[in-house]
């Protein structure tokens, strides 16, 4: 039987670890709420921008507009934007997104391309920089805000635009983690450039809200549908030409897409960390209970042994 002091020390250590994991779970929950608030705050701008672009689209055919962000040219080179976290302790979040990038990269190589990587997050940077002989890294971004802001998306968007407009890349794809629920998220691949006119003004969108029910954290998701009141009046007169308007608005739309990917990734990371820390807390509780049982058995055995020795000594 193990030494009583060793078991007692182990119990104290496990209980202290549980306090840490529980605190990390609560911190992650609070940050999910902040991420939710950030999404809601950015929603009005994104909605109005989509309405303006829809209004322009209703008047002119985007295909007839000479905008470099809409031009589809022969694809000779491709850039992949990969979004991971700066930190670990979030379950399989980073591993899953890196695997998705590896799979997509291998697919493009088989098609005869040599993709460039634009890496966001220390985990992706560390992983792919250790494999420079297999991957081409164009640029890196790290230490972004845990609740992404427009400033965070600006630098990434500028890098993407520079790659596409200079024709170093003919297509830009972004690989990020889509937030589904607190216990479910999935890596997805989305084409950023060239922009698709049909996908610029979506009919429906989703937002998430973190709520509580019976002392448990839950996520409510709802569709945001366009209403007639949100549509811009049809008699609005634009002073600039469609080309000028789109040259100004499309980069904003692209930046909003990047920001959305960052926000979804951040929410997914925090949700995965909540789940991981919750599981760690449950495991610590179970381990502490098992150790307590072992300690009590060891203590009982020691007391029994002492009694037997005393009884044996008195008989002698």
UniProtKB/Swiss-Prot annotation:
Q: Which family does it belong to?
A: Belongs to the ATPase gamma chain family.
Quote the subcellular location field of this record: Cellular thylakoid membrane
Q: Any keyword Thylakoid?
A: yes
Record keywords: ATP synthesis, CF(1), Hydrogen ion transport, Ion transport, Membrane, Thylakoid, Transport
How is the protein disposed in the membrane?
Peripheral membrane protein
Chief subcellular location: membrane
Q: Name one GO molecular function term.
A: proton-transporting ATP synthase activity, rotational mechanism
> Organism source for this protein?
Prochlorococcus marinus (strain MIT 9215)
Q: Does the keyword Transit peptide apply?
A: no
According to the record's subunit comment, the protein's assembly and interactions are: F-type ATPases have 2 components, CF(1) - the catalytic core - and CF(0) - the membrane proton channel. CF(1) has five subunits: alpha(3), beta(3), gamma(1), delta(1), epsilon(1). CF(0) has three main subunits: a, b and c.
Record-linked Pfam families: ATP-synt (PF00231)
Gene Ontology annotations for the cellular component aspect, listed alphabetically: plasma membrane-derived thylakoid membrane; proton-transporting ATP synthase complex
Listed name of the protein: ATP synthase gamma chain
Task: Report the protein's function.
Answer: Produces ATP from ADP in the presence of a proton gradient across the membrane. The gamma chain is believed to be important in regulating ATPase activity and the flow of protons through the CF(0) complex.
